[in-house]
Amino acid sequence: MAVTSPILNVMIKAAEKAARSLIRDFGEVEQLQVSQKGPGDFVSAADKRAEELIFEELKKGQPTYGFLMEESGEHAGSNPDFRWIVDPLDGTTNFLHGIPHWCISIALEARGELTHGLIYDPVKDEMFTAEKNGGAFIRRNKRLRVSGRQDMMRATIATGAPRRATGDQERFLREYTAVLNVSPGLRRFGAAALDLAYVAAGRYEAFWERKLQPWDVAAGILIVKEAGGFIAELDDHKANPLETGNILASNEGIFSDIKKVLKSTA
Ligand code: 2AM
Ligand code: CA
């Protein structure tokens, strides 16, 4: 059993509290599917409630740290060196439709470097955690390791599509086609943080998506790296995918191949 640090314990407590609230609300959402209006407003309230619970719990643990959160944005802390990056509900569309594939994502950044990451899927009760230089774990006790597969033809690769209003749909379709040609096991599950956790767990060999937000990827970046995986910016190897939101996560075995295939579509 790995020893859990005090910081990670605070994150786990916050995630478990938010999870209880989200699980209750997810039960309601399943009932609301039949109504004509749908559960849209109800889900945004659920999302905000979860964010508030996480905020309170993290604040109690570390009163001086700042925050970057999906719903309420940036809160400066009195200590400028530390910042929590939080997505209270990643995979919102799944949640809204009663599809049990969504999660909570919490990361800690210290002086601009990711030091702690947690991704929690409470429906499957799978918690993925990592601490910098301390490895990545599932359910707090089993070490995570990226997959050893090296053959694109036998790989499982996940992606996410850009939204019509903000994304380059043509580019996405070119990338999708190019990857599908060499790797038939393509998936699109709709929760970027979980996609990254699954790369870390060796379930997919790779995941790529563009225009994500920092809270979608912060925890996942650290978890993938600590599981022995590679993270890259899709267009500029010097840029930080946490800032640009264009991310490729992969095991070592297919990293250069998938990068080449994606680049060939530019
Ligand atoms: P969300 O559920 O928190 O909105 C789906 O492709 C994944 O992308 C989800 O993790 C979703 O997070 C995230 N996402 C967030 N903003 C997005 C955007 N503007 N366009 C596409 N996907 C976005
Ligand atoms: Ca998200």
Label each PLM-derived region with a short phrase.
Residues K48, E71, P88-G91, F95, ...:
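Generic detector of well-ordered alpha-helical packing
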Residues A107-L196, T244-A266:
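Acidic beta-strand-loop-alpha-helix segment within the catalytic core
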Residues F95-G98, L186-F189, A218:
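Short glycine/threonine-rich catalytic loop with a Thr-x-Gly-x-Asp
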Residues L22, D47, L58, T92, ...:
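Residue-level signal for inorganic ion chemistry
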Residues M1-K13, E170, R174-N181, L194-A266:
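Oxyanion/phosphate-interacting regions
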Residues M1-L89, F230, K238, K260-S264:
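N-terminal subdomain of lithium-sensitive/metallo-dependent phosphomonoesterases centered on the IMPase/IPPase/PAP
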